Amino acid sequence: MDPRSEVVLRQQQYLAIKILLINPPADELAQQLAHKHQVSVWTWNFADHQYFQHQSIQSDFAVTFPDQIPDQVIIFVPKSKELLSYLLHVVVSHLPAGQHIFLVGEKKGGVERASKQLQSYGKTVKLDSARHCQLWQTTIETTEQLKPLEQWLKHYSVKNENIQLEIYALPGVFSQNHLDIGTAVLLPYLNQIKLGKIADFGCGAGVISAYLAQLSPHNEIHALDIDAFALRSTEFTFQRNGLASERLHLHAVTGIQDAPKALDVIVSNPPFHQGIHTDYSASEGLCKTAKQHLNTSGELWIVANRFLNYPLLIEQTFGQCQVKTDQQGFKILYAKAT
């Protein structure tokens, strides 16, 4: 069991009947709490959502607060400070004064910093500190009027050759405030890819998806991500740039295995973080199995950190892998299915 969950169980006497777990790890906590409490989950991680559904736990995969209002919430501190600000705002917009918010997280994950954000809404006390984790409790004194989701968007401009886009990103989405270096290195090469049915794996705020949609009206874009906030951000990016919604197909995925088949192109600046932890499994899985989702002569384009040995993984399934460029610490890798 995750150490954060163990800390929650140590202080179970503080919990009310109806509990909402926000951003919990995929472990046995919800099932154990369900013996004495009515437990539900709000998560934006599709893999975690599927796990809880399989465990018969009520789970909402969403960017907004669930319809059923709990007595209390337990927030597992996210990596993003902005995302925690959003979560706290949403919670105090739905729960009345006097109810409790619990905040749990790892010390290395910034729980002490997060507890200071919690103090804005009421008297805050530390209930426990164990397993390199802390559990905090606040009694809500200050409630807020719910702000529209759009007010949480940040945006920035992307320009390359004749393409100009405004990128819109919700809290917690990769590279929310500016274009990341890897994608910037990739953009000049996107006009070389085949037209057709294209998957953007790990779409984030939709930079690559929107760019490809702007390049040609013949491109059918499939935006794939594990994160509900990323998928919603991509949708906002298309809307705000006047790109036809019928050309965008959003897919919540746990990995490339959930991607559509018969694709002409898979393009990706693949994710390599799960919360505060580094995790290369999704990107390595992409290198190994992308070919199964491509048509004959279909293409794979990947941004990779220079130190990662992805060319070898790609060569094992495609037979070859070209390095289109190597700059600013990133390689653009290309392979063609045969």
Swiss-Prot record:
GO cellular component: cytoplasm
Alphabetic keyword roster: Cytoplasm, Methyltransferase, rRNA processing, S-adenosyl-L-methionine, Transferase
Keyword Acetylation set for record: no
The protein's enzyme class: transferase
Localisation: Cytoplasm
EC number(s) given by UniProt: 2.1.1.172
Catalytic activity: guanosine(1207) in 16S rRNA + S-adenosyl-L-methionine = N(2)-methylguanosine(1207) in 16S rRNA + S-adenosyl-L-homocysteine + H(+)
MF GO annotations: 16S rRNA (guanine(1207)-N(2))-methyltransferase activity; nucleic acid binding
PANTHER family given in the database record: RIBOSOMAL RNA SMALL SUBUNIT METHYLTRANSFERASE C
Similarity remark: Belongs to the methyltransferase superfamily. RsmC family.
Subunit structure: Monomer.
Role description: Specifically methylates the guanine in position 1207 of 16S rRNA in the 30S particle.
Protein's recorded name: Ribosomal RNA small subunit methyltransferase C
Gene expressing this chain: rsmC
